[in-house]
């Protein structure tokens, strides 16, 4: 018995040595053809002998990998955590196939090729902390916007299958379930997914909401979805690049004609005066309990303005904005591509009153939720407007909802809101339904994104070189590029010229 097994083992090793450049499937096939491997005829009576090799997989994945390049293969994706049962071979192969498909997707659509780790360990670790989610969930303007937008979208969610990308605590998934969704798949790659499952159970929604832990791109879902919901926005809107996962979900997981909430977004830019920042962090050294500590002011300037980008500073005074903003970048979630998003170039010209303090540029963003349900008073207005359908001035006025600084829902029209907000978030699309806007513009109310300031190294007092003009021209070009090595980050380059006497030219490069 032992001699037969040793002989068989020797023959197999000789065969493997001859065929070492062939794949595992090829080796198994050759062994079977030559009748070298007959596991059914082996009667193993020694417990120390190895068990027979496993049956080849039912699902055959074609490949050309050889022993010469096997070390170059990427590590497999993390397997979805299932506490109740061990992952099966079929599940593992399905996960590997899902990652291969996502790699093929990014290889095709991303100008930088297949996605790297995106600093995943640090990124997802930070989103496992309750303190970070406390900041987001109790950002009353942020959470109120999603709550009201979802509550007013029952016509969108009724009996639909919904995907929550980056579910965090699961709060949006619960909102969606209560709005009438048939099924909600909540996905998060951080450990917060386990806490989300507790929240879902605690609120009696486990029959509707299923939580997945893992990267969206590596999960095989049981069905396509009708609606995608996500709070993907970062500082400067696109920081963290989470929007790429939303685009992936749209292209691979959503049925044709599906809906994404929020549906549109825009970034704005304007020259800005931030005396409040200077007074709080720099000029305050001039008088401290009757002591003149002004010698520290230049050191404070050097330290605070060294990196030039000041994140998470809220500008409360709308008058700090020195001219009407430009629309720096627009995003339609139904059509935006990763390639288009990866680079933005925009020229600008602002006219700023002479004598203004100019500290640099401020940026903010807005997102919109469209196709909200009609209220009873909306229906009444629509009926009245239909009676005067030939009168352009009496055409239908869709509701325009916003969230005030206290987190309360405000109903108005865009025309009225634009006046109240001093035109800081101009629309780039034609309103054709009831809409809710969540704005991070100065003066609209604090939120955890605040604004992003691109500050000069020192304060400038503007005075036009043309004495006939009351304003000073600020011209320039801004270029936004995704960092090729750390793709959750973005480079911001600015070429700026001030029409002063003498002319002032500058180039700054910021990393966000």
From Swiss-Prot:
Domain of life: Eukaryota
Sites where the protein binds S-adenosyl-L-methionine: 133, 142, 166, 217
Enzyme Commission number, as recorded: 2.1.1.319
InterPro entries, per the entry: Arg_MeTrfase, Methyltransf_25, PRMT_dom, SAM-dependent_MTases_sf
Compositional bias segments (type: Low complexity): 88-99
Principal cellular location given in the protein's record: cytoplasm
Compartmental location: Cytoplasm; Nucleus
Region (Disordered): 67-103, 375-395
SAM-dependent MTase PRMT-type domain mapped to chain residues: 120-508
Active site, renumbered: 231, 240
GO biological process: chromatin remodeling; methylation; negative regulation of DNA-binding transcription factor activity; negative regulation of DNA-templated transcription; negative regulation of NF-kappaB transcription factor activity; positive regulation of apoptotic process; regulation of androgen receptor signaling pathway; regulation of DNA-templated transcription
Keyword S-adenosyl-L-methionine found: yes
UniProt catalytic activity: L-arginyl-[protein] + 2 S-adenosyl-L-methionine = N(omega),N(omega)-dimethyl-L-arginyl-[protein] + 2 S-adenosyl-L-homocysteine + 2 H(+)
GO function terms (MF aspect): histone H3R8 methyltransferase activity; histone methyltransferase activity; nuclear estrogen receptor binding; protein-arginine N-methyltransferase activity; protein-arginine omega-N asymmetric methyltransferase activity; protein-containing complex binding
Keywords, alphabetical: Cytoplasm, Methyltransferase, Nucleus, S-adenosyl-L-methionine, Transferase
Family: Belongs to the class I-like SAM-binding methyltransferase superfamily. Protein arginine N-methyltransferase family.
Function: Arginine methyltransferase that methylates the guanidino nitrogens of arginyl residues in some proteins such as histones.
Protein name: Protein arginine N-methyltransferase 2
Native species: Dictyostelium discoideum (Social amoeba)
């Amino acid at each position: 018995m032992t001699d037969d097994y040793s002989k068989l083992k020797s023959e197999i090793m000789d065969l493997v040595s001859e065929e070492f450049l062939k794949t595992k499937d090829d080796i198994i096939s050759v062994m079977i053809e030559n009748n070298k491997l007959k596991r059914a005829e082996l009667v193993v009576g020694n417990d120390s002998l190895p068990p027979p090799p496993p049956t080849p997989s039912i699902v055959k994945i074609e490949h050309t990998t050889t022993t010469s390049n096997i070390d170059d293969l990427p590590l497999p994706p993390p397997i979805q955590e299932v506490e109740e049962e061990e992952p099966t071979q079929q599940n593992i192969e399905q996960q590997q196939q899902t990652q291969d498909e996502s790699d093929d997707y990014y290889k095709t659509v991303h100008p930088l090729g297949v996605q790297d780790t995106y600093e995943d360990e640090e990124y997802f670790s930070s989103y496992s902390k309750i303190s970070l989610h406390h900041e987001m969930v109790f950002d009353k303007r942020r959470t109120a916007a999603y709550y009201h937008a979802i509550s007013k979208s029952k016509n969108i969610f009724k009996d639909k299958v919904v995907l929550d990308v980056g579910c965090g605590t699961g709060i949006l998934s619960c909102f969606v379930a209560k709005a009438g969704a048939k099924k909600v798949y909540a996905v998060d790659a951080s450990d917060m997914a386990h806490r989300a499952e507790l929240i879902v159970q605690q609120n009696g929604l486990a029959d509707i909401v299923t939580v997945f832990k893992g990267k969206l791109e590596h999960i095989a879902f049981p069905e396509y979805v009708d609606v995608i919901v996500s709070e993907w926005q970062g500082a400067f809107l696109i920081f963290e690049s989470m929007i790429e996962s939303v685009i992936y979900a749209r292209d691979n997981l959503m049925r044709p004609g599906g809906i994404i909430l929020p549906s549109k977004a825009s970034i704005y830019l304007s020259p800005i005066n931030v005396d409040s920042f200077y007074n709080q962090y720099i000029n305050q050294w001039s008088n401290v309990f009757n002591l003149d500590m002004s010698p520290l002011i230049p050191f404070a300037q050097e330290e605070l303005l060294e990196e030039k980008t000041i994140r998470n500073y809220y500008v409360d005074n709308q008058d700090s904005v020195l001219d009407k903003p430009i629309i720096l970048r627009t995003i339609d979630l139904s059509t935006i591509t990763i390639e288009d998003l990866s680079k933005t170039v925009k020229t600008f010209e602002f006219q700023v009153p002479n004598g203004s303090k100019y500290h640099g540029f401020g940026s903010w963003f807005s997102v919109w939720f469209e196709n909200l349900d009609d209220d009873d008073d909306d229906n009444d207005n629509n009926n009245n407007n239909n009676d005067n359908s030939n009168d352009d001035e009496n055409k239908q006025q869709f509701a325009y909802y916003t969230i005030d600084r206290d987190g309360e829902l405000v109903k108005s029209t865009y025309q009225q809101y634009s006046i109240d907000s001093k035109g800081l978030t101009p629309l780039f699309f034609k309103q054709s339904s009831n809409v809710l806007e969540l704005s991070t513009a100065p003066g609209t109310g604090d939120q955890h994104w605040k604004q992003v300031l691109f500050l000069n190294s020192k304060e400038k007092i503007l005075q036009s070189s043309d004495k006939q003009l009351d304003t000073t021209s600020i011209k320039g070009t801004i270029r936004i590029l995704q960092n090729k090595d750390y793709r959750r980050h973005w480079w911001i380059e600015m070429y700026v010229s001030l029409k002063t006497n003498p002319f002032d030219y500058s180039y700054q490069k910021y990393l966000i």
